[in-house]
């Protein structure tokens, strides 16, 4: 018999509303519709299938306020994470959102009707309070950045009626709903289940940790990785799931099963650990492993941890009686080479020799093709990782030039393209400012909003080419720091990004202008001209600073080649 769900009843809205499917589908076609984002789809799926029980919809203002301030729903039941549907003021007006209104929620990928929302209320959240109480308030925290930069200004609360399941086309056999995994446990005869949350590949230490947890609690293991949204820069879920499948035979026969969780993580540390425990309880687990820095986003730009290493364990311990799932705290596992075994760090006697490979070191070994020892990971796991992580000389990268008009960006970019093409080994794509404006952004103007859109489009194309192993060279003006930083973050999901500030002085750019564009701008014939009547924000942290007044194009290209070579991106001779 699996663990009762949070609140006592599994809120499986898919099963509840299935008898009314035809009626709801017909009504959904007649209602105003809202296309959901990827994060909203993740939340919706886990509301509809009962993963977020006792929720039956997106939180209204009363529930939201109590969760933010007290870790509880208005009913008093423990719940630590706000589950909200954010909308803009424009959307409120377009869809007629008000109490009692009904709207269809659709999948942005295929326009499929997923649910009908009956609006309870529309409210403006206190984002500063949410950021502080739920995530700690650090503006560099990814969830706080999402609140301020991405989430719309209003939330809509209300109950849901399920119309259709979300369609998935990958690893369908592993995507158990809470009801399905509970049935699977019953079929296997499992009554005690330890759930293990992860957003990373698993290695020998993780296998040892989960087996120890199962052994000490006389339980079986549910490997329950997140395949929704995780931390930017994480290894993609396709690779990770192949790793988990490769690892599974290393468990004693019948000990472990693999199930995938379509969760949009918030990286919320202590609050998230409580939330994760509730979700695993809803999936029938009786025990839940909480490790060091559980669901933490790491460090901020000053090198300070967002959360303490064991804050998450303290949080779940505080609410253990209410959670209804036994939390299994675990220290980091470390390898002891002299005895060829793993042990928790707090159980290793002083003076005993230990070995460990950090995540940073593992990524470095994958990039360089260096050996990953068998004491750290299994050969079949390493094989999967190497398939998705070719050596540095085969990885894509982007070089983005920024500077005033006529600063020499285009000449440097063209020369760099020729140099890389001469070397060979990967395709090279060149995007010059005027070409991009003509081919990709012809309808955009030169105000700040349109300039940012132009850089965002360049970054999107560059990220896709980088992902496929190409070298991308882009030379827009890119005058604004935020747009440049957003471009870096997008491209770095898939490969290296190098910002080159072509810091040729404005006076020199104007003096050597043979096309007369500066003169026209000075005469008022060209509006929003960077350096004359529109600002240029000097890059805060460029990877390279060059100056065409003092340096030749050839010497600048050589500097860039040396930079790329030092990072292992070019073949060494």
UniProtKB/Swiss-Prot annotation:
GO terms of biological process kind: cysteine biosynthetic process; hydrogen sulfide biosynthetic process; methionine biosynthetic process; sulfate assimilation, phosphoadenylyl sulfate reduction by phosphoadenylyl-sulfate reductase (thioredoxin)
UniProt site positions, description: Induces change in substrate recognition on ATP binding: 330
Top-level EC class as recorded in UniProt: transferase
Enzyme Commission numbers on file: 2.7.7.4
Alphabetic keyword roster: Allosteric enzyme, Amino-acid biosynthesis, ATP-binding, Cysteine biosynthesis, Cytoplasm, Methionine biosynthesis, Nucleotide-binding, Nucleotidyltransferase, Transferase
Catalytic activity: sulfate + ATP + H(+) = adenosine 5'-phosphosulfate + diphosphate
UniProt-annotated stretches for the region N-terminal: 1-169
Site (Transition state stabilizer): 203, 206
Record: residues binding ATP: 197-200, 291-294, 333
Regulation: Allosterically inhibited by 3'-phosphoadenosine 5'-phosphosulfate (PAPS).
Free-text note regarding domains: The adenylyl-sulfate kinase (APS kinase) is non-functional. It is involved in allosteric regulation by PAPS. PAPS binding induces a large rotational rearrangement of domains lowering the substrate affinity of the enzyme.
Subunit structure: Homohexamer. Dimer of trimers.
Function: Catalyzes the first intracellular reaction of sulfate assimilation, forming adenosine-5'-phosphosulfate (APS) from inorganic sulfate and ATP. Plays an important role in sulfate activation as a component of the biosynthesis pathway of sulfur-containing amino acids.
UniProt name for this protein: Sulfate adenylyltransferase
Organism the protein comes from: Neurospora crassa (strain ATCC 24698 / 74-OR23-1A / CBS 708.71 / DSM 1257 / FGSC 987)
Gene name as annotated: cys-11
